[in-house]
């Protein structure tokens, strides 16, 4: 019987490589799109639409815990002035991965993992550390992967284009949008 894996998905483009590969490895893989860190809401909707396209392609289901940006802001707002990659991002990773691990434990999943490590801009050691901590806290296995290895990011860009997926130009929160020069 295959292991049930809950795959935390930060965005559809970043899931184009991990989702099919986990499935090919024999995992019964379900996506988990946290999304409450994504601002504004119109951006969340664009990313959700892209995820629905990918979901149809990989023929799998996705858990949508609900869009609740106020819950995310209550944790991250105190770090609004932090640069991209700082304490705010650590809090954001922990918020998302803890929500995924909790859901996995409460819904009979054996393991949890994330697509976050495909990005060349993210601290993969920190992501995997937080993932392992939150999985242990909830009694599920953490499947550590560094998806950006072996040109993972480049392959995800190519696959996203092939599928016609929306590709965003900032991580997700309004602060990362500001840091990328989108918002003044």
Please provide the spans of the model-predicted regions.
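Nucleotide-activated chemistry modules centered on ATP-dependent adenylation/adenylyltransferase
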Residues: 1-184
């Amino acid at each position: 019987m295959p292991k049930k894996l809950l795959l935390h998905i930060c965005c559809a483009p970043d899931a184009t490589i991990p989702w099919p590969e986990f499935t090919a490895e024999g995992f019964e893989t379900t996506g988990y799109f946290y999304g409450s860190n994504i601002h504004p809401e119109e951006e969340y909707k664009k990313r959700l639409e892209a995820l629905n396209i990918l979901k149809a392609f990989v023929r799998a289901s996705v858990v949508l815990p609900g869009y609740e940006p106020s819950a995310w802001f209550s944790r991250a707002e105190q770090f609004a002035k932090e640069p991209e990659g700082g304490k705010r991002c650590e809090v954001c990773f922990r918020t998302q991965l803890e929500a995924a691990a909790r859901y996995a434990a409460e819904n009979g999943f054996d393991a949890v993992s994330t697509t976050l490590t495909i990005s060349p801009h993210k601290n993969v050691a920190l992501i995997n550390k937080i993932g392992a901590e939150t999985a242990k806290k909830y009694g599920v296995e953490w499947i550590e992967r560094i998806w950006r290895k072996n040109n993972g990011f480049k392959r995800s860009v190519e696959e996203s284009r092939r599928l016609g997926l929306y590709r965003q130009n900032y991580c997700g929160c309004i602060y990362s949008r500001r840091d990328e020069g989108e918002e003044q």
